[in-house]
């Protein structure tokens, strides 16, 4: 049969209590020693009996373990306190953020309502003075828009005038350059024209030369005809009269 489970509760019998304490104390010290050896751990054990007697065990110096325990505990407590403070600050910050968020939402709603009223909407809850103020605000906005529009148009007109003036100046400069080029290239063209001309390239000049040659030939022919006519006339006029004269010998001799 197995061992029955012992109910964990205070032992009322004093003698039985002392016997149980002695057995379990020795077993606890043995387990602590085995733990320090097997796991290379620093173990400290302090036991106070019900009669006030102290029992202790430490794998190393007890003061060193207690000092380390105190430092670690203090650090842990400080860390816990710091974390607690951070949590408090975070909660306060969250509350501030929430309040700021609420105020921002209210401001956003107010601005959206003002925009809608500027558009001529959501006017039901406005009083007469509020409507007059809104009307004045809209009139000022309208005047500002008109002034800005006029200024933009004036700026565009001024830019157009500047561009027109610049274009006229450039046109005048180009015209002067063209006139100067025309004056400088005129005589050069006249001088070079006879060198570049040829019968095939200049039909008008060739035709004029042919006309001049024809005129010269016609003039020479006319002169030749006139010369021949005058020569014949002169020959006709100066033709001597031949008379036959018989001399004593009986022969005929021609005489003028």
From Swiss-Prot:
Residues 179-232 are annotated as: Disordered. Keywords: Developmental protein, DNA-binding, Flowering, Nucleus, Transcription, Transcription regulation. Residues 199-215 have a biased composition (Acidic residues). Its main location: nucleus. Residues 222-232 have a biased composition (Polar residues). Probable transcription factor involved in the negative regulation of flowering, probably through the photoperiodic pathway. Prevents premature flowering. Downstream regulator of a subset of the MIKC* MADS-controlled genes required during pollen maturation. This is Agamous-like MADS-box protein AGL18.
């Amino acid at each position: 049969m197995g061992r029955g489970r012992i109910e964990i509760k205070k032992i009322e019998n004093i003698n039985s209590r002392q016997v149980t304490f002695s057995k379990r104390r020795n077993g606890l010290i043995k387990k602590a020693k085995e733990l320090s050896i097997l796991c290379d751990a620093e173990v400290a054990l302090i036991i106070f009996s019900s009669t006030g007697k102290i029992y202790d065990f430490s794998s190393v110096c007890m003061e060193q373990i207690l000092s380390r325990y105190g430092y670690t505990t203090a650090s842990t407590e400080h860390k816990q306190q710091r974390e607690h403070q951070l949590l408090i600050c975070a909660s306060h910050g969250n509350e501030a953020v929430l309040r700021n968020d609420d105020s921002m939402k209210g401001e956003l709603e107010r601005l959206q309502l003002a925009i809608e009223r500027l558009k001529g909407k959501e006017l039901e809850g406005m009083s007469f003075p509020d409507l007059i103020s809104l009307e004045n605000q809209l009139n000022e906005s309208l005047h500002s828009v008109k002034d800005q529009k006029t200024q933009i148009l004036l700026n565009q007109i001024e830019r157009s005038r500047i561009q027109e003036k610049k274009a006229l100046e450039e046109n005048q400069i180009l015209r002067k350059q063209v006139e100067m080029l025309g004056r400088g290239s005129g005589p050069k063209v006249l001088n070079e024209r006879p060198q570049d001309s040829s019968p095939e390239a200049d039909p008008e000049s060739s035709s004029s030369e042919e006309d001049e040659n024809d005129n010269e030939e016609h003039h020479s022919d006319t002169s030749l005809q006139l010369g021949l006519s005058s020569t014949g006339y002169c020959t006709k006029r100066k033709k001597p009269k031949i008379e036959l004269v018989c001399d004593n010998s009986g022969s005929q001799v021609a005489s003028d």
